[in-house]
Amino acid sequence: MSKKLTFQEIILTLQQYWNDQGCMLMQAYDNEKGAGTMSPYTFLRAIGPEPWNAAYVEPSRRPADGRYGENPNRLYQHHQFQVVMKPSPSNIQELYLASLEKLGINPLEHDIRFVEDNWENPSTGSAGLGWEVWLDGMEITQFTYFQQVGGLATSPVTAEVTYGLERLASYIQEVDSVYDIEWAPGVKYGEIFLQPEYEHSKYSFEISDQDMLLENFEKFEKEASRALEEGLVHPAYDYVLKCSHTFNLLDARGAVSVTERAGYIARIRNLARVVAKTFVAERKKLGFPLLDEATRAILLAEDDE
């Protein structure tokens, strides 16, 4: 490995690379979420027949993973670089390996393994065939071919590549703690994120108002349903994301039992499924505008028969 890229240079390099492969560069979605997969740029766009190629950085919050900034590798919030390509290119793995070369990682000089790890997200009714990518014994990426999203079978299949940016940067910069990662020249990761990490951990585990969170979950659930009754997919999905994050806060606080946990997940999943079905129906009303004319004509004609 030659130059040790800063965290922001890693992002810029991946953005330029995937832009060159035909991906749109999206921006992080402005609602809390546990993974880049939950962004509407993946969750909604992975369903239906329209093509979609996008790449974006997604800050991902997982309250139960907070460790007050005392653990060098486990975080309340981490950053994912998300790539979604639909339909999936036949050479997606080769494209991924080439992206590592752009980061200064020569696949011929390192032990890179694709370890089978099929993926499932019960709260959104999503699943797919997947692999973890291990670089010299450390997981740096999750590869997934979506088979189902929001309870709907995917056709065409979407390929998702999710880089764990903190892990990747730790490897490239050869540091043992994420807080020692150089974000930009002269600025360490910890100088930006250590204090928020501590505060969010303290809030999630000790301070959050359980009664308020329980009440908020009910309100967000009702508002999502109300928006769906009007066919308003995106506002509804925003409230699904709010339900998910609120549940994660309750879970971190130990406010839900094992039985209740399954019930909350089912409620979020049911909403996500309705959002998915409504999104495809609304795109159909628009004539699936991202399809080429020939494919659009065939699909719409089939539906008219």
UniProtKB/Swiss-Prot annotation:
Keyword Ligase in annotation: yes
Coarse class of the protein's main subcellular location: cytoplasm
Keywords carried by this UniProt record: Aminoacyl-tRNA synthetase, ATP-binding, Cytoplasm, Ligase, Nucleotide-binding, Protein biosynthesis
Entry GO CC: cytosol
InterPro entries: aa-tRNA-synth_II/BPL/LPL (IPR045864), Gly-tRNA-synth_heterodimer (IPR006194), Gly-tRNA_ligase_asu (IPR002310)
EC number: 6.1.1.14
Record gene name: glyQ
Record-linked Gene3D superfamilies: Bira Bifunctional Protein, Domain 2, Class II aaRS and biotin synthetases, domain 2
Reactions this protein catalyses: tRNA(Gly) + glycine + ATP = glycyl-tRNA(Gly) + AMP + diphosphate
PROSITE patterns per the UniProt record, alphabetical: AA_TRNA_LIGASE_II_GLYAB
Listed GO biological process terms: glycyl-tRNA aminoacylation
Family membership noted in the UniProt record: Belongs to the class-II aminoacyl-tRNA synthetase family.
Pfam families xref list: tRNA-synt_2e (PF02091)
Protein name: Glycine--tRNA ligase alpha subunit
